[in-house]
């Protein structure tokens, strides 16, 4: 068994900075040549500490950025113009992709459509809410104002 230090996240093995033991062939033929790991040395322990400190700083910065974006999203209603009939029923439904595009068009930053959760199908004009998971610890509620247009 070879003791190595991961420099990148490897699925099923660990995150960057973790010290793990793997079979010699896996380390020698896959992890080391691709730069996913370094052989473990006492000097490598210092490198592990610097990798972990950098990861913690990145995580802290991403949480702060997500909280700032959540505050901005929660405070500003987003207007969605969709095709609708005279009675107010939509031709189709509002999808997460539509919400993400409307948020970006409103100048509130870009969000991934896969992070948008619409609790119920939106099939008529009116005011609704949608949830956005910006980070695993941070989410925001967006006020949607669906109006007939186009």
Swiss-Prot record:
Keywords attached to this entry: Ribonucleoprotein, Ribosomal protein, RNA-binding, rRNA-binding
Keyword RNA-binding: yes
Gene Ontology CC, one term: ribosome
GO biological process: translation
GO function term, MF aspect, one: rRNA binding
Gene3D superfamilies per record: Ribosomal protein L9, C-terminal domain, Ribosomal protein L9, N-terminal domain
Transmembrane segments: none
HAMAP family: Ribosomal_bL9
Family: Belongs to the bacterial ribosomal protein bL9 family.
Role summary: Binds to the 23S rRNA.
UniProt-listed NCBIfam families: L9 (TIGR00158)
Official protein name in the record: Large ribosomal subunit protein bL9
Name of the gene this protein is made from: rplI
